[in-house]
Design a protein with these regions (language model features):
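Gram-positive cell-envelope targeting signals
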Residues: 1-2, 413, 504, 510
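Membrane-lipid interaction segments
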Residues: 2-460
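Primarily a LysM-type cell-wall glycan-binding module
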Residues: 452-490, 495-510
């Protein structure tokens, strides 16, 4: 006989696809006429970006591009650069139809190599790694109670974070940044660096208010024979994202990434290029969760008949911390040459790892520091060196398994010259992350009692004397003898289910 089970709905995020894809970057191109011939290549830099995502049944298509910047010097030892856009489209086949699912895709350059075939022709080879996650909010039924006085149930409540939804919004930023009066007019742009960081997220009913900043640095060649100069700016933004069902008691894990970045010099009223035009497209993504206590049954048995119990394992996730912080890294770097002048220093995050230890989340990784400089003979030189960083963040320890996928961006980078062959790098990093606890619980999802198979008992025995062992629980003892938990507590005059080692119990069997 199938028992009358009271069931309730539990909402979870189900990962339909979670894997890495690889996109090759293979191209050869010729420099345009306005670019001088290559004498020496300093650096080939590649920045991949996902521009758009689409889902069609069991297929996901990602469209994007890789911005490849070639930094080199010509025969007259002048700094030069050329930017090449490599478009791509990547399709992933999913194990089943995923209509209505959410897509999160992050692209990172695994490696990039370039070779000057001639003074004007360049061959590039590389690969972009894309982390793709396709997930959907699903509903699972669990048993919260059983309506039968002959059934013993073990009721528990589990704190869980119920996923309320996932929302994305694109933000366009258009800004013109004029040069200062002390800076020379722009002849050409050598290199650009940009990053975006979420500073604050506030939840109001059905909406998330996201505040953040975009950081832009531009290295350019001035007109005439001047040394390359730098423009740096910070552009704040604020945006409202609609998320149905969220309240001010919910938590929100919000991240930002740059999808499109176009930086060009602009001609001003003086008929000179004295302004930088910035056109950016930023993707804001928010995963929202609300805390809840979920009633459930972890075990059950019949005191009279044999029963078939079906179980399922459910993994609950809960946000324990949300982080939006900045931290500073200082590292000294020994150079392979004596410097006459440093033109520019920049950093990029190469990799990042997290571990949890003694109530702290430790974020560590590698920064690649690049230096444009001139040596004692005023010859252009490029130097790069990896340096490690580590940052510790306190978090609330829990019983579950914590995990975190932090977003780390370089906010600013500066330097101090210590000696002719040594400099100190000051890097400000912004970290944005949600720390999650994952807890897997085995639950009763169905129960069927076989009334044709009564539990065999010794009819001459109405009570058993049992000595509790070290690992025994009152529930295990009741289950072993198919006895009533309340009757055991009543006969033994117990106020709680706590047992002392070696305690003698009277277990009524009728």
């Amino acid at each position: 006989m199938k028992e009358k089970c009271l069931k309730s709905d539990v909402f979870l995020n189900e990962n339909i696809f979670c894997d890495s894809l690889e996109q090759a970057v293979d191209a050869d191109f010729t420099l345009p006429d306005f670019c001088p011939d290559i004498s020496k290549i300093f650096k080939c830099n590649a920045i991949p970006r996902i521009v758009s995502k689409s889902l069609n049944g069991a297929s996901v298509t990602l469209d994007g591009n890789v911005t490849v910047t070639i930094l080199y010097c010509d025969k007259e030892n002048r700094f030069c650069s050329y930017e090449y856009i490599y478009p791509f489209s990547k399709t992933a086949e999913l194990p089943r139809d995923a209509s209505g699912s959410n897509i999160i895709a992050k692209a990172k350059c695994d490696y990039i190599n370039c070779r000057a075939v001639t003074g004007r022709k360049i061959d590039i080879h590389g690969a972009v790694g894309i982390n793709l996650r396709v997930f959907k909010r699903k509903c699972d039924e669990i048993i919260s109670d059983i309506d039968d006085e002959l059934i013993e149930v073990k009721r528990i409540t589990s704190p869980a974070t119920v996923p309320m939804g996932y929302a994305e919004k694109y933000l366009l930023i258009e800004e013109d940044i004029p040069l200062s009066s002390a800076q020379m007019s722009i002849e050409s742009i050598l290199k650009t660096n940009s990053s975006v960081c979420v500073k604050e997220t506030k939840i109001i009913n059905d909406k998330a208010v996201v505040k953040g900043e975009m950081f832009v640095s531009v290295l350019y060649c001035p007109e005439g024979e001047g040394t390359p100069q730098i423009i740096k700016t910070t552009l704040p933004f604020s945006q409202i994202i609609d998320i149905d069902g969220v309240t001010d008691s919910c938590e929100c894990d919000c991240k930002a990434e740059i999808c499109v970045m176009d930086i060009k010099p602009k001609v001003t009223a003086s008929a000179e290029q004295r302004c930088i035009g910035i056109n950016a497209k930023i993707l804001l993504s928010c995963e929202s969760y609300c805390s809840n206590e979920i009633p459930m049954i972890s075990d059950a048995f019949s005191r009279k008949f044999e029963a078939d119990i079906k179980r399922k394992n459910l993994a609950f996730e809960k946000i324990t911390n949300t982080i939006s912080e900045k931290f500073n890294c200082k590292k000294s770097i020994d150079l392979d040459f004596n410097i006459n002048n440093i033109i520019d220093v920049w950093c990029s995050v190469q990799n990042c790892y997290t571990k949890f230890d003694d109530g702290k989340m430790v974020v560590s990784g590698t920064l690649m520091t690049g230096i444009f400089a001139c040596d004692e003979n005023n010859i252009p030189i490029y130097f790069e060196k990896p340096t490690d960083f580590e940052y510790k963040i306190p978090f609330n320890e829990t019983m579950g398994i914590p995990h975190c996928d932090p977003q780390i961006e370089v906010v600013s980078c500066g330097f101090t010259i210590i000696s002719a062959a040594k400099i100190e790098i000051h890097t400000e990093l912004g970290i944005n992350a949600g720390i999650y606890e994952k807890k897997e619980i085995s639950l009763v999802c169905d129960m069927e009692v076989d009334e044709n198979k009564p539990i065999k008992r010794d009819k001459k025995c109405a009570m058993v004397i049992y000595y509790a062992g070290e690992n025994d629980t009152l529930w295990d003892i009741a289950h072993k003898f198919s006895a009533s938990l309340n009757e055991i507590m009543s006969v033994n005059k117990m106020d709680s289910e706590d047992l002392c080692n070696g305690k003698m119990l009277l277990v009524p069997l009728v």
